[in-house]
């Protein structure tokens, strides 16, 4: 594999020599950093089983190597990487897999280790959505996830990835993560804090990642991380699990942050060792039981993961002074909800008791029941999935609801050819050889729902959202 030139400040190299255990070779560390990062993907088991995915993609000649800490994760090699970007494959467009760095699959593996089955989870720094979607898959779209992102520009990307993967149990917020301890005390069974960090572990992906690095900036970032983990710990219920992770390598932003929390709440913090998380985990194990992953150990990005339990309650923080505002939705009455459910089933949309119907003007939404306890405590950027808009002739079903709820076995499902599916993703109407009978047609490809179309004569009118329309070369190889 080709080398690339990574910029290393001298002070960084000194710090790494001190941080690295004697069992590891510093020369191996430098060599690993110079190698480009291996590509990796995670199968979205909300859409397809791993076995079915492997069978579906077998004709492509992809080399898929299992990632030890994630049953759904694989390093991927393709003979001609430039011929078609992974993001333009049919399987990616329909949400069958997520392009995710292997080491970033570790925190969620730790969160659900030892049979942990949380019902309400918070992802404090969620964009672009790799870990939120991984959590949702582990929860099988049950329970509820609060996915927060401080950066306004990244909330849109987070929502797009959640929608593509067919996730229905997520509420999105846009806050500084330091507010949650006061705003939502003891509300979560599990919390993932993948903290903002100095990014020392990502040099294999970005050779210039350390251009603005300094020991002083590490100290400043660590101060913010301490405030974030303190807030997250307050939002965690007693008995709950907190996973703290970063993609950096210095001890100041990693072990020291966790040790600070234990010193602050000595009777409430229990470190849960991760040495048995997967075969070979002991190679990265610290004396505290954390995983400090240097890039040469598993040939991946540098990463850090700690898991801890809140063993007892801690003093609550003063209530926040901000006003949430009126919640603009109201629950749909049972009789009307039954009519809506029946109409939705007619086009192949079904949902279980984990979701409840709410209404705002002419909009119909499905919210996860597990998030209702948070209503009135925080302001949501987006909650659940938009099911439909009502109009005089019935309902205008929404694309995100189709992707999350549709059954491809519905009587009105219509399977497209590869060429027709590509036309669909380009936002064009489709002219199948044999037009379907129904007026509302659930469009599928590879037996996966990809949208809803209106039949007009022999034409299927495209309803694919404009913001998702793709140009350029797609999976049939035609530009």
Swiss-Prot record:
Its EC number is 2.1.1.178. GO terms for cellular component: cytoplasm. One of its GO terms (molecular function) is rRNA (cytosine-C5-)-methyltransferase activity. The keyword Transmembrane helix does not apply. It comes from the Bacteria. It is found in: Cytoplasm. NCBIfam families: nop2p, PRK11933.1. This is Ribosomal RNA small subunit methyltransferase F. It comes from Escherichia coli O7:K1 (strain IAI39 / ExPEC). The lineage of its organism: Bacteria, Pseudomonadati, Pseudomonadota, Gammaproteobacteria, Enterobacterales. The gene is rsmF.
């Amino acid at each position: 594999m080709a080398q690339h030139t990574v910029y290393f400040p001298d002070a960084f190299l000194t710090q790494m020599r001190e941080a690295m255990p004697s069992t590891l070779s510093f020369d191996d560390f430098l060599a690993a950093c110079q190698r480009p990062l291996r590509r990796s993907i995670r199968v979205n088991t909300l859409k397809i089983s791993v076995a079915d995915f492997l069978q579906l993609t077998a004709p492509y000649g992809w080399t898929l190597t299992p990632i030890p800490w994630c049953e759904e994760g694989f390093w991927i090699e393709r003979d001609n990487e430039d011929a078609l970007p992974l993001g333009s494959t049919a399987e990616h467009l329909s949400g069958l897999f997520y392009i995710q760095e292997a080491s970033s699959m570790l925190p969620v593996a730790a969160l659900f280790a030892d049979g942990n089955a949380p019902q309400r989870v918070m992802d404090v720094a969620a964009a672009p959505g790799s870990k939120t979607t991984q959590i949702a898959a582990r929860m099988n779209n049950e329970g509820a996830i609060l996915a927060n992102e401080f950066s306004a520009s990244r909330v849109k990307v987070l929502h797009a990835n959640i929608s593509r993967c067919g996730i229905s149990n997520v509420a999105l917020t846009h806050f500084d993560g330091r507010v949650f301890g006061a705003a939502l005390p003891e509300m979560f069974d599990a919390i993932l804090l993948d903290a903002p960090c100095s990014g020392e572990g990502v040099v294999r992906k970005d050779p210039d990642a350390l251009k603005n690095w300094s020991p002083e900036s590490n100290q400043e970032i660590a101060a913010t991380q301490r405030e974030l983990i303190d807030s997250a710990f307050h939002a965690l219920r007693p008995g709950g699990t907190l996973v703290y992770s970063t993609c950096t390598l210095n001890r100041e932003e990693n072990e020291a942050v966790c040790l600070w929390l234990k010193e602050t709440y000595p009777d409430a913090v229990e470190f849960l060792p991760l040495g048995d998380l997967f075969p070979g985990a002991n190679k990265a194990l610290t004396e505290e039981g954390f995983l400090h992953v240097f890039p040469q150990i598993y040939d991946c990005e540098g990463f850090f993961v700690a898991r801890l339990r809140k063993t007892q309650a801690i003093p609550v923080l003063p209530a926040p002074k901000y006003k949430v505002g009126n919640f603009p939705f109201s629950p749909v009455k049972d009789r009307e909800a039954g009519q809506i459910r029946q109409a939705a089933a007619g086009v192949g949309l079904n949902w279980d008791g984990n979701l409840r119907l709410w209404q705002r003007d002419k909009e119909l939404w499905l919210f996860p029941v597990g998030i209702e306890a948070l209503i009135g405590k925080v302001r949501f950027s987006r909650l659940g999935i938009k099911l439909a808009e009502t109009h005089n002739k019935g309902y205008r079903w929404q694309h995100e609801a189709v992707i999350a709820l549709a059954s491809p076995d519905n009587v009105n499902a219509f399977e497209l050819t590869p060429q027709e599916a590509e036309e669909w993703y380009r936002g064009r109407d489709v002219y199948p050889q044999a037009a379907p009978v129904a007026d509302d047609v659930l469009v599928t490809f590879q037996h996966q729902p990809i949208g809803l179309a209106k039949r007009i004569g022999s034409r299927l009118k495209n309803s694919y959202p404009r913001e998702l329309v793709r140009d350029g070369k797609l999976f049939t190889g035609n530009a």
